Amino acid sequence: MSLSRCLPLGQNARVIIIPARLAHAASTQAAAATDDAPNFFQKLAHRFQGVPLKGEAHAPKSMFEDCNKEWSAPEPLPAIPKDFKEHPDRDLVNYPYPARPMYPPKSRLLMMPDSWFTPFQKVTGVSGPYLFFGGLFAFLVNKELWVFEEQGHMTVGWILFYLLVTRTAGYKIDQGLYNGYQERVNFFKGLIQEDLKEAVEFKKTSAKQTESLNSIKESYPTALKESMALQLEATYRKNVQSVATELKRRIDYLKETEESKARVEREQLLKLINSEVDKEFSDRSFKDKYLQNAIQQLKGLNVQL
């Protein structure tokens, strides 16, 4: 579309025709070229808008994404067991163990505890506590019971600075503190596990020894009976061997005694016979008698050569 239709035609009039489509096409090409190669400020604007640049698969994470977010822990802090007692006389009903709160208590006006407002609501309603504390503050300031120093106006700046930090970086600070706390807890748990490693190994060894002792107790009567039988058999064999040795010794002694006795008797008998024979030979009458008889017998023999 051109501007020629919007202008009246005259003799001395000049009409300038501008091709709108070509201008639009030129601006479109310039914008496309700018998107392909954005400058520094365009990149910065894309970063704040969360628009991914060319070549990025995902949109960039904005630095203000965690602003005004409330952090909550994925799991609560470990609590003390209810049956835990450091001493049997500890009264857990009247004096329980103090529990570490995970989150700060409920507050109003960013710093006033909610427990200060609750008692007034039963009598004055919801607005009563605010009027009371506001009037008390005005009374103390008016009567100069609460005197501001020269730097008192700086409190407003510190409050604004606190709100700015907590609303912008409070989520990341809480998350970092929680992760650091978990790492510290895991570190101390590792130390405790290392200290109790020997106790755990001793417990396992004791359990195995207990099982072995129970199995030994079950088979102990049979083993004791077999052991006693072996001991009795060994003692019996030893006694039998002792009896056999003693009996053999006594038999050998009797045998040697009888042999010695027989030998002595034989020697005495031979000695007696020899002495009697020698005595007879020494007698002349016996010698002559038998000698003559022997000579006659020899003569009567017919010797043949």
Swiss-Prot record:
Listed GO CC annotations: mitochondrial inner membrane; proton-transporting ATP synthase complex
Transit peptide: 1-22
Principal location class: mitochondrion
Alphabetized InterPro entries for the sequence: ATP_synth_Bsub_B/MI25 (IPR008688), ATP_synth_F0_suB (IPR013837)
One GO BP: proton motive force-driven ATP synthesis
Keywords in alphabetical order: CF(0), Hydrogen ion transport, Ion transport, Membrane, Mitochondrion, Mitochondrion inner membrane, Transit peptide, Transport
Places the protein is found: Mitochondrion; Mitochondrion inner membrane
Regions that span the bilayer: none
Gene Ontology molecular function, alphabetical: proton transmembrane transporter activity
Disrupted-gene phenotype: RNAi-mediated knockdown results in either embryonic lethality or arrest at the L2 to L3 larval stages. RNAi-mediated knockdown results in a delay in somatic development. RNAi-mediated knockdown does not cause sterility.
Recorded family membership: Belongs to the eukaryotic ATPase B chain family.
Subunit structure, interactors included: Subunit of the F-type ATPase which has 2 components, CF(1) - the catalytic core - and CF(0) - the membrane proton channel.
Protein task: Mitochondrial membrane ATP synthase (F(1)F(0) ATP synthase or Complex V) produces ATP from ADP in the presence of a proton gradient across the membrane which is generated by electron transport complexes of the respiratory chain. F-type ATPases consist of two structural domains, F(1) - containing the extramembraneous catalytic core, and F(0) - containing the membrane proton channel, linked together by a central stalk and a peripheral stalk. During catalysis, ATP synthesis in the catalytic domain of F(1) is coupled via a rotary mechanism of the central stalk subunits to proton translocation.
Protein name (database record): ATP synthase F(0) complex subunit B2, mitochondrial
